[in-house]
Amino acid sequence: MKIKMKFFSIFAVVAIMLSFAFSTLDRKIIVIDAGHGGIDFGASVENKTEKEIVAKIARKIQVLNLSSKVEIVLLRNGDSKMDLAERAAEVSKINPDLLISLHVNTSTNAAKNGIEAYVYDKSNFYEQSLEIAKGLVKAISNENLSEGKIQNARFFILRKAECPAVILEIGYLSNTENREYISSDSGQSVVAGRILEFINK
């Protein structure tokens, strides 16, 4: 009886370890890079700052994630300044399945509005990045954020990423309607929820 109990105990431990190993292998790691931070405020209009808005959206994405198959890693957790080289090095160390860098736009044209995205067309992951960018822009756009274009760009974080990578420009602070929406708790929750919903597809 003791031998049988010992056998079943060992079997149970092995089964748990194998289950954990396979669940870890199946898990996607998504890095969310909240742009700017610290003394770098990014875009700023009427006391609304880019660094604060994107940090709040990033945190909401992490908090809302209940999937065991997706791990959300925040590149900037808190109001700290990280230069581009530090960000790229940290992303490389994490080795994620996807990098999403969150930003907010601004323009001298106050009528300009909506969500846009950037990808790097010389990346080994260009096709994947482009499809992800299209999907994210479509998923987030609504009556408050119009569906904007996808552009190619040589931004440092995109050039250095060794995985699919997208920069999201979530609305225009210079546009009154966009500013009110993306600076509100409800608007940020909707944006975060739609990003997460797309990731979990």
Each model region followed by its residue ranges:
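Active-site-adjacent substrate-binding region
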Residues: 127-151
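Bacterial Sec-dependent signal peptides at the C-terminal "C-region" and cleavage site
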Residues: 5, 10-28
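Catalytic-core regions of hydrolytic enzymes
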Residues: 25-134
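Conserved beta-strand segments of alpha/beta enzyme cores
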Residues: 71-73, 116, 146-149, 164
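Active-site-adjacent mobile loop/cap segments within catalytic or ligand-binding domains
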Residues: 31-33, 42, 101, 105-109, ...
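N-terminal secretory signal peptides that target proteins for export/translocation
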Residues: 1-3
